[in-house]
């Protein structure tokens, strides 16, 4: 007896339809019936079927590969639903692999045609809010510092209150019991504006994972996601063809970030700042450099973290009176490798914003203050892009990352006309808003503009959610305001403290090798400078200090004379200052090659072995003054005369 016909339901991104079929029919026989319900330009060979929405992990099979298989043999029954995936012929011609329309058929919500293009190029690219890691506490590898801070209880110990405590010396009461690291009264008393990252983590964890509930552990951190989900399970066409409440981002309510991933920036020596300022002193143009250092525990705040800067590398750039234009940094990976061999990593960026006051006393104009701005909208966007490139790995986040430890420092004039350092970070919300192309810099530095979907100048496909922030209105009441078209940049900014160590002991004790990429002011790195640095005149202590220069190490790396093991040894000599390592270094083939290069270039190489195992290095000289003069004391040097001639030249 023939089987009774059944009705199968099909759902694709263009809608749903039904087909009446026989259980004995083969799958390929459905192709023509299915094509009747699909767009005319559908490629027949691209049709695939799945038991779940396409792209959500179902069992997807191409219809052509099911030849010889009957519908009844796979268990399909009356009323079952199958999900369709397919591609248009034009999409295949354009090289699309996901079937999304990439030509003018892609439209905004207002109907304006746009191509399907990536809006912002930032690495690494998060995929979606659902791209979580299973058991991140077992998989994600944190930094050793984060692991060490995780093991600390972070409690703030208090002494016995002689007035309020009635118990003995071994007792404890509410007046002397340890406080949590996020205690608001303690933070207000110590004038700590932002929680440290691990204090904030303890605060969230106390509310998310309560031990008394004995529930399964949930990571307390979750990165914001302000973009349209590309893996929406609703079955509608992908954005910008379609959108629903499941895939569109919610409205954004901006508020000052209560925590910071780095609490303090410490410069190991004032000479680091002075060397960067020297470029401005000689040219009058601004300068930018990347900070290399380490992250360490900062004991001034509970569970705090500080970035200790040991070196500043100045990448290729065009410097102007009012800003800097960065060129492509071809040897960035090589510089990062040299830093890694010295135990360092890229921790931030620093740039100058200085203008001589013209008083003749070295004072500069104060442009950044409470009535103007501290970090402009363009600079916040720049900081957010850099922070997006260097995410912070953490096992307390469902995606395995949260925020960034990358810092941004500015050298500018203070209210007294002196040159001072300021340290900042862009908030986590700011990084995601820049990544989602929701905001853009304004000509007014104190405000950030919200993008508009109707703006077709960039010809990009983006969804702009509603953005709100709270402010004190003219009646003294905190009221919610619509952030369009612009809002204050303070909502995207986190301030950090900065300073210098009480007893300076920099990792690199020499700093007179010419700094890279300064040819515009007549300074260049040449072999004669290497020969001059390495002449010890029999002084082993001086010879050890000679290679303890980050800029010299980067230049030697560019010569490719040392093997990887020899470069690692060179890094140890530069940072540890061990005479035994120095003796081993001058016995390597790479060192002999360097001597040969200096001889063939006509420069004078070291005349004798400059290290002895019996000798020990002298004490490292103390750090210089922490006062940054606006101009050098002696204007009679050759560099000063060159600077005077250069100052009138164009920097473009």
Curated annotation (Swiss-Prot):
It comes from Aspergillus oryzae (strain ATCC 42149 / RIB 40) (Yellow koji mold). Pfam families: NPL4 (PF05021), zf-NPL4 (PF05020). It is a peripheral membrane protein. Gene3D superfamilies: Cytidine Deaminase, domain 2, Phosphatidylinositol 3-kinase Catalytic Subunit, Chain A, domain 1. Disulfide bonds: none annotated. Involved in the import of nuclear-targeted proteins into the nucleus and the export of poly(A) RNA out of the nucleus. Has a role in the endoplasmic reticulum-associated degradation (ERAD) pathway. One of its GO terms (biological process) is ubiquitin-dependent protein catabolic process. GO terms for molecular function: ubiquitin binding; ubiquitin protein ligase binding. This is Nuclear protein localization protein 4. Residues 94-108, 116-130 have a biased composition (Polar residues). Residues 265-402 form the MPN domain. PANTHER family: NUCLEAR PROTEIN LOCALIZATION 4, NUCLEAR PROTEIN LOCALIZATION PROTEIN 4 HOMOLOG. It is found in: Cytoplasm, Perinuclear region; Endoplasmic reticulum membrane; Nucleus membrane.
């Amino acid at each position: 007896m023939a089987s009774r016909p059944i009705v199968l339901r099909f759902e694709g991104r263009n809608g749903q339809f039904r087909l009446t079929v026989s259980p004995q029919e083969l799958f390929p026989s459905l192709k023509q019936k299915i094509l009747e319900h699909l767009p005319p330009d559908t490629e027949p060979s691209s049709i695939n079927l799945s038991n779940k929405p396409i792209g959500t992990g179902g069992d997807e099979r191409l219809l052509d590969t099911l030849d010889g298989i009957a519908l009844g043999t796979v268990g399909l029954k009356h009323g079952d639903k199958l999900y369709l995936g397919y591609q248009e012929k034009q999409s295949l011609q354009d090289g699309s692999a996901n079937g999304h329309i990439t030509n003018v058929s892609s439209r905004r919500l207002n109907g304006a045609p746009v191509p399907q293009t990536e809006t912002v190029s930032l690495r690494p690219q998060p995929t979606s809010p659902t791209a979580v890691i299973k058991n991140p506490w077992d998989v994600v590898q944190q930094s050793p510092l984060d692991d060490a801070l995780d093991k600390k209880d972070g409690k703030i110990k208090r002494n016995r209150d002689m007035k309020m405590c009635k118990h003995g010396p071994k007792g404890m009461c509410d007046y002397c019991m340890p406080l949590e690291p996020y205690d608001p009264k303690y933070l207000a008393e110590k004038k700590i504006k932002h929680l440290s990252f691990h204090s904030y983590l303890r605060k969230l964890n106390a509310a998310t994972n309560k031990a008394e509930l004995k529930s399964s552990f949930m990571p307390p951190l979750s990165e914001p996601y302000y973009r349209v989900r590309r893996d929406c399970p609703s079955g509608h066409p992908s954005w910008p063809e379609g959108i629903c409440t499941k895939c569109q981002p919610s409205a954004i309510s901006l508020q000052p970030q209560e925590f910071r991933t780095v609490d303090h920036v410490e410069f190991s020596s004032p000479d680091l700042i002075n060397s960067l300022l020297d470029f401005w002193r000689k040219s009058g143009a601004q300068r930018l450099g990347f900070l290399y250092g380490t992250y360490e525990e900062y004991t001034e705040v509970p569970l705090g973290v500080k970035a200790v800067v040991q070196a500043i590398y100045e990448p290729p750039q065009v410097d102007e009176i009012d800003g800097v234009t960065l060129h492509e940094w071809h040897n960035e990976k090589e510089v990062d490798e040299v830093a890694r061999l010295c135990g360092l990593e890229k921790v931030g960026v620093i740039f100058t914003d200085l203008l001589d006051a013209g008083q003749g006393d070295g004072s500069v104009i104060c442009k950044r203050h409470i009535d103007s701005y501290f970090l402009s909208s363009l600079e916040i966007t720049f900081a957010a892009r850099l922070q997006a490139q260097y995410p912070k790995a953490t096992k307390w986040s469902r995606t395995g990352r949260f925020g960034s430890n990358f810092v941004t420092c500015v050298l500018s004039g203070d209210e007294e006309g002196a040159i001072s350092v300021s340290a900042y970070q862009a908030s986590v919300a700011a990084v995601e808003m820049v990544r989602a192309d929701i905001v853009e810099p304004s000509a007014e530095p104190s405000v950030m503009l919200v993008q508009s979907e109707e703006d077709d100048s960039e010809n990009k496909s983006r969804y702009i959610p509603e953005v709100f922030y709270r402010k004190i209105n003219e009646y003294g009441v905190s009221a919610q305001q619509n952030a369009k078209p612009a809002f204050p940049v303070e909502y995207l900014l986190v301030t950090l403290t900065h300073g210098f160590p009480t007893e300076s002991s920099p990792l690199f004790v020499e700093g007179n090798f010419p700094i890279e990429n300064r040819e515009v002011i007549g300074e260049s790195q040449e072999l004669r400078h290497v020969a001059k640095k390495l002449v010890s005149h029999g002084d082993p202590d001086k010879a050890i200090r000679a290679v303890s220069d980050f800029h010299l190490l980067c230049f030697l790396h560019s010569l490719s004379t040392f093997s990887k093991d020899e470069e690692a040894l060179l890094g140890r000599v530069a940072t540890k200052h061990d005479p035994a390592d120095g003796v081993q270094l001058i016995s390597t083939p790479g060192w002999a090659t360097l001597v040969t290069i200096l001889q063939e270039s006509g420069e004078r190489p070291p005349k004798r072995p400059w290290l002895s195992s019996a000798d020990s290095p002298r004490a490292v000289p103390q750090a210089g003054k922490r006062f940054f003069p606006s101009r050098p004391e002696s204007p009679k040097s050759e560099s000063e005369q060159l600077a005077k001639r250069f100052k009138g030249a164009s920097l473009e």
